[in-house]
Each structure stands twice: as structure tokens, then as C-alpha cells.
Design a protein with these regions (language model features):
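Flexible phosphate-sensing "switch/lid" loops adjacent to ATP/NTP-binding sites
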Residues: 1-274
Length: 274
């Protein structure tokens, strides 16, 4: 998003369906995924519910609260969510069309993997949106997790011929170390796949950007006698835990996420999150 914004093109983020308990509130009072709000900031525009028309907020392993175009629309279990695929796609297409009328370019983000073969029938955020928007696709692989060659080549192998034709390039994300150490890897991927590797993005530490799904344990600090020690109870489905980032960054405050009784022994403040 930021890269396109810096070229002077008006751009907006879009993710048709997101699953996260970390939500952001737009100026109009609607809820969207925290990631889309951050991406909107990178685009230099205000966030809007059309950037994330379907937000699923899990309340158990098998059910979720359903937020559609910013408003809560009840809750559904997993099987009922699959039954609503056509409805979700229609809502996503409506939001995308409105958003497309306001900007020159839209960056579509998928969900999960691009090759979830067991979920093709209920896919909302990936290939249905690519087809609707007639979009070109960048396949982004996270090398920091390991297995990047299997990620890229395995994904391409599982795509249909038409899906594969949509892919214009591969981007390797979160690369640590010297770029020249991956030249051989780039060559291998290009020869094996026939698709160019358009970029290798370095791992950037210390960005302090809000996480959407994974709790950022790096924001925790060690309790001491000279700090105000805050323990946040680590609940299984804690929502909006990024709200604690500002507190963790405050001078004189130490914050930890606690899930054992002994973790609370030195705490001056205990917070039970929502």
C-alpha cells in the first residue's frame, strides 16, 4: 500500500473477509480488521467499512460473531458460515465496487493460503475476488517461517491453470541477512516455476506495527522494583490486545501477559481484558 501511495496514485486496501478479534473502529463507527485500518493509514486515507466488508470475530473454536460492512449481524457456527458464502460474496462485491469508484488502485489481500483446496467452494477473500476485480496476483511467501521453496512451488502446483495465469510474480518477505545469499534461491524459483521473483523484502525489526492475529510478545517488558508492573490476564480469545501496546511503550511501565498464578506475584496492576 505504501509503495503505491508514494508514487502519487490514490490507493486503498481491501480484504473481503477477515477473521480476527482485533478490530478497529472507523470514523462512522463501523468495525473492520485492525490490519485494514493500518493499511489505510499507509495509503494516506481514512479507514472505511468497505475496506473489510466481512469481519468474523471468533468466540469459540467453532463459532464467530459476524460483522458485515461494519455492523454486527449476529453469530454463526462454522457450518452456517459456509452456508452464507453466496451472501458474503455479494456483500464483498458491493463494497469493492464502491471502493473502486473512489480510488485509482486497490490492493487486494487474500486470506490464509492461495491454495486451500478443501475450501474452494466457500472461498470469499481469494480467487472469487481476483475474478471479480479481474486482478493480477502477487504471490507473497514468508521466508522467516522456513520452507519458502515448498511454499511457493507447492502453492503453484495446487492452483488451476487459470489461477496460475493470474500470477505475475513472486515476492519473498521477511528475509534476514545479506540479499546476495538468496540469489541462488531466486534463480531456482524462477527456473522451476517460470514466474519472476519481483522482490526480496528484508525483515525489519522495531517497526512497532500493530499485530492482527498473533500476540506480540516482544512488547512485553521485565518487572522490576522501579517500574509500575502491569499483568494482563492471557485469556484464550482476548480481543484488541493491541490496545496495550501504548501502555507497554510508556516509560516507567513494565507489562506482561500472564497465564500462571506466579506471574501475578509482583504485579502492581492486574488487567482482565475483554
Amino acid at each position: 500500500c505504501r509503495l503505491v501511495y508514494r508514487t502519487g496514485i490514490s490507493v486503498a486496501p481491501f480484504k473481503a473477509q477477515n477473521m480476527s478479534n482485533n478490530a478497529a473502529v472507523t470514523r462512522q463507527g463501523g468495525e473492520i480488521g485492525r490490519a485494514q485500518a493500518l493499511q489505510a493509514e499507509a495509503c494516506g486515507i481514512e479507514s472505511h467499512v468497505d475496506m473489510n466488508p466481512i469481519l468474523l470475530k471468533p468466540d469459540s473454536d467453532e463459532s464467530a460473531q459476524v460483522v458485515m460492512q461494519g455492523r454486527v449481524r449476529g453469530r454463526s457456527d462454522a457450518s452456517a458460515l459456509f452456508d452464507r458464502t453466496s451472501e458474503f460474496r455479494r456483500i464483498a462485491y458491493e463494497s469493492y465496487s464502491r471502493l473502486a469508484n473512489r480510488v485509482d488502485a486497490i490492493i487486494l489481500e487474500g486470506a490464509g493460503s492461495a491454495a486451500e483446496v478443501n475450501l474452494r467452494h466457500c472461498d470469499v477473500a481469494n480467487w472469487p475476488m481476483v475474478d471479480y476485480a479481474d486482478a493480477s496476483v502477487l504471490l507473497v511467501a514468508d521466508i522467516d517461517r522456513g520452507g519458502v521453496f515448498a511454499q511457493v512451488l507447492g502453492t503453484l502446483d495446487l492452483l488451476t491453470l487459470e489461477e496460475r495465469r493470474r500470477i505475475i510474480g513472486v515476492v519473498i518477505n521477511k528475509f534476514r541477512g545479506r540479499r546476495e545469499l538468496f540469489v541462488e534461491g531466486t534463480t531456482f524459483l524462477e527456473k522451476r516455476s517460470g514466474i519472476p521473483v519481483l522482490g526480496v523484502v528484508p525483515f525489519l525489526s522495531g517497526l512497532r506495527l500493530d499485530q492482527e492475529d498473533s500476540l506480540d510478545h516482544g512488547r512485553q517488558t521485565v518487572f522490576s522494583d522501579s517500574t509500575v508492573n502491569v499483568a494482563v490476564v492471557l485469556l484464550p480469545r482476548m480481543s484488541n490486545f493491541t490496545d496495550f501496546n501504548a501502555l507497554a511503550a510508556e516509560p516507567g511501565v513494565a507489562l506482561c501477559y500472564a497465564d500462571r498464578p506466579e506471574h501475578f506475584a509482583k504485579a502492581d496492576v492486574v488487567i482482565i481484558p475483554g
